[in-house]
Amino acid sequence: MNDTTKPLFGTADASYQAAGELAGIQQLVTDFYQIMDTWSGATKIRAMHKSDLSQSADKLTCFLSGWLGGPRLYQERYGSISIPGFHAQWPIDAQARDAWLGCMQQAIERQPFSADFKGYLLAQLSVPA
């Protein structure tokens, strides 16, 4: 497939495909929470979560699936979501935002995604953060 026929990230399911579909998203989320658990820069945001991260991981996986153009698993399992409303339950400041993005940046770098998709994904995740 050449550049003129390659789907653009953010259209249809191009981002979902670029992420490796559900298995790729699950690996990204697994790495994200592993980094959050071990990186000293994430201590503040790790404390905002329960000790068992399995539900948080499932919710993030489900959210990212739909957000990237794949199956809307979050809505199926948990109902509708409003990002500002969801985040209102925590005292998120610039330090917490930067820690979350730092964990995600490190997790993205571990993935076998294309360099273009890595840059795109981090930029898009920075918008709601």
Task: Give the positions of each predicted feature.
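Core of compact, soluble alpha-helical bundle domains
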Residues: 1-129
